[in-house]
């Protein structure tokens, strides 16, 4: 089940998370690359240090996603789509993520096992 999250309330949804998010990019072959990232808010952007692979992938394909795991079993994960820009200064790389869409998501209990629906997603507005 997914619940949309309004971008105007995203900072509150992020503040409720107890774990660091994973930043999801894709490499030249389309394979996913995931890495944990420490982020802070700067205006409307989420900003944090990133590695070489993330910088390379994000520069080539700036449409990325962030995934915050649920705080406890049965809770919602927070999934945020974002546009990534990488600032490079000396040997340091800084990811600047501008959120474009966000949802809370969790698997749903399937009331009828003969159906294909197996998720309980809700947009966060």
Show which residues each predicted segment covers.
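Polar/charged alpha-helical tracts
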Residues: 8-12, 42-43, 92
């Amino acid at each position: 089940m997914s619940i949309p999250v309004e971008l105007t309330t995203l900072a509150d949804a992020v503040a409720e998370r107890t774990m660091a998010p994973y930043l999801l990019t894709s490499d030249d072959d389309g394979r996913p690359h995931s890495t944990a990232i420490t982020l802070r808010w700067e205006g409307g952007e989420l900003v944090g240090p990133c590695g070489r692979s993330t910088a390379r992938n994000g520069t080539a394909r700036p449409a990325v996603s962030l995934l915050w795991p649920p705080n406890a079993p049965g809770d919602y994960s927070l999934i945020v789509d974002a546009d990534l820009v990488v600032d490079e200064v000396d040997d340091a790389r800084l990811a600047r993520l501008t959120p474009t869409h966000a949802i809370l998501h969790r698997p749903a209990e399937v009331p009828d096992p003969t159906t294909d629906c197996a998720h309980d997603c809700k947009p966060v507005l």
